[in-house]
Amino acid sequence: MLAVDSTRYCVLTHTTPQPIDVKSSSLEAELRAILVDKSVCYGNFTLASGAQSDFYVDAKLTTSNPRAALLVGRIGWKLVKQTATARGVHVDSIGGLTMGADWMALSIGIAAYLDSPSSDIQTFSVRKSAKKHGQHKRIEGNFLKGQTVVVVDDVITTGDSTLQAIEAIEEAGGRVAFVIVLVDRQEGGREAIEKGGHAVVPIFSRTDLLGTNAGRRSHIAVA
């Protein structure tokens, strides 16, 4: 979360991204350009942790954009297929903690269906707490006990949101195969998740997205 007072501001960067040797795929290059253009914001911010930041990445401005969602879906599904094959697992469903995972999971699920309708990949969303009415669900959507799932998240920092989703899924009887993230901030989150035995596959790292000149003081914050 992000704390901002009235003297602080965010300006979207509608500029051409600096050339960085990242992924070779043209789809990934286009997605990176959209992320930098739509989601990288600059200002003076105090994060909930108390850390100071002069920029943050609001990844939801990208994952909720139709063109970017198409790219996230195609790239994400490619990574799901490659990683599942390498690890010898069958994936039943894709999801994660709301809201960071929601658009991303659905985009990948749609891409999976378009690529292979017979794969029957489903999607779901993990609430931060169970509903207090109706069926009192914490996991909404297409998830069943005993399924093997891929957890997704738009940005990981400490990994807490992803770990919350993993805990909820495992408590509900699911098996987590691995984790796909859009942006790894490289601030310990990946290591925290992998310490629990779950591989993390990022589409972009902080360095991929912003280069090596982001500055030690700067952090990518989750809005």
Task: Locate predicted features.
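Solvent-exposed alpha-helices and their adjacent loops that cap or buttress functional pockets
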Residues: 49, 116-117, 141-145, 168-172, ...
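Short helix-loop-beta connector
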Residues: 86-91, 144-146
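Short glycine-rich phosphate-binding loop at a beta-alpha junction
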Residues: 88-98, 180
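Acidic, divalent-metal-coordinating active-site segment for phosphoryl/phosphodiester hydrolysis
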Residues: 155-166, 188
